[in-house]
UniProtKB/Swiss-Prot annotation:
GO biological process, one term: adhesion of symbiont to microvasculature
Keywords of this entry: Cell membrane, Cell projection, Cytadherence, Membrane, Virulence
Subcellular location: Cell projection, Attachment organelle membrane
Primary gene name: hmw3
Domain of life according to the entry: Bacteria
Protein name: Cytadherence high molecular weight protein 3
Record field: compositional bias (Polar residues): 220-236
Organism: Mycoplasma genitalium (strain ATCC 33530 / DSM 19775 / NCTC 10195 / G37) (Mycoplasmoides genitalium)
Role noted for this protein: Component of the cytoskeleton-like structure which stabilizes the shape of the wall-less mycoplasma. This cytoskeleton-like network of accessory proteins containing HMW proteins 1 to 5 allows the proper anchoring of cytadhesin proteins in the mycoplasmal membrane at the attachment organelle. Essential for successful surface parasitism.
Residues covered by region (Disordered): 220-241
Amino acid sequence: MNDKQKAKINKAYNKLLKKINKRYPDVSVVYARDHKNKVHALYQDPESGNIFSLEKRKQLASNYPLFELTSDNPISFTNNIVSLNAYDDKNNLVTVQYDQDNNTFYDQNGNVLDVSSYTDEKKVPLINYLSSTQTSQEQPTQQDYPSIDAGLPKIEVDDQPKAAQHTTLETESEPDVFELNDSLNQPQQPTENLGDDQFVEKEVPPTQQLHQDLVHQQPVQVDSGSQNHSFNNSPSLKPPLVNKPAKLVQPEVKHIPQVEVQPKPQIVEPKIEPKPEVKHVSHVEIQPKPEVKPVVDSVPEVKQPEVKHVPHVEVQPKPVVDLKPQRIEPRIESKPEVIKHIPQVEVQPKAQMVEPRIEPKPETKYIPQVESTPQVEVHHWKPEVKTEYQPQQPLPTSGLQIKVVPRSAALLQSKLDTGFQPRQVERTTDSDITVSVSSHASLLEKINALNHQRIMSDIALKSDNTIKSSNFSRFYPENEYVATKYSDPLYSDTNQSLTSDRFSLDFDYTPKSRVNNYTPLRSTNFQNNAISNYRFSRTPSSYYPLTRRPWRLTNISSYRSSFHSPTRLSSFRRTSLPFSSSYDGLRRYPSRSYWSKDF
């Protein structure tokens, strides 16, 4: 196999490896090549032993020739099972099957066999065939696994007392020729001659003795183990003065083993004493604690007079508690007032919404009285009205017939006597409008106002030639107008129509720059080509045409709260708002969020 073929196989292997790892991440796959150097991803069914090609998703024949990727060695999927003759625990000759791949023994029936007591024909235990890392049948010796505590002294706290511990360790240890350890042993020597009382006062010896015991056992490591083990190998204890001279003295150590065995049992005896001494130390620590307790008892004594003063403080805030609801009540009253005025302030500058806001007020006041007045007037005054004033009507445009009735002194006197106020608008049986006036000037003013109300005349024609009761408010005399800032110019100026165009800017108007007095091109308004026709709220932000804003800032269903609207969550949106022009350019660009602004 040349390098070119190897490179081709390696490229195909890397490509197949990514594909198989993505599709079968949890399957153990064997990669091999056939005699045509085509790479295969192979999987063997553990139960049936059949071989499958994962990339082709089909089963391969058992004798299909397969080779390793980088060599000509054939790959065999047959189990490596060897038959052995062995002797069981009763010394009977048995045939055993050894699976070299799985490293297990089986009997003739295919069951896993425990070969702990089996030997082969050469009397070699069958356990030796198994690797100790894969089976638990063979117990590893300590030589196979060095202990974690190698090179450290074994301190058995509970099994034997300290006296026996030190005698065994020190007899094996070598004598301290340079007497370096004697300086460490000095704190122990005065304890032999001291009594318990004198020893208790120091309170330090337990910690000194623990350090002394650890340091005193250091020479054991030099001789008991191999000479390579020293304190340089132990992580925690590295006293340099003890270690290095001990290594230098090793040849002379053997001559004085018995000299130091005798004095050190004397040191052992006080080591038994610190155990009760430690108990005394704990008792000494307990004694000052009750001395602190009376101090703790005195603290609540100081608190008791403080508790007496607390109710006096409670008496003072009681009137304060009474004042709090009084202060809260005007706050609660003021909040709904602010909420009521906020929508009214927003609605008034909108010309479209002015009419529906003003109209409902006179409905409740005058409609029931209008219905009651014809009962008094119809019988006496109808024939006179029709004969005298019908040929004089000057309103042919809208099909709306208006009849002017002069007031008679007798009728006014009869109504004043009964305490009944006459109304200005009356409904007749012929669905006509009767306007009663007291002077010729007011008559001309009312007719002038009616002539210029094209919207109201269209509504009257669409509703069977009858003006709706909600529109009567515009026919009242000036002294009964609803006081709004639109009342005078709205009905007296004949040059202005009632559409929203009266309040809107010119459609082609674009504000000049405040810097160089230059009017930008209309193309700067491509984000919203009705930017200059923002209705009645030309906010400062609208002078920056490239900023995206909702297309109708102030006019979103202001005649009704869109939160309470039954269609607020539906996809249906009104195509035309009341009293708005169909040419205002805004309607052609519907908003994506028509009602979301209310939230």
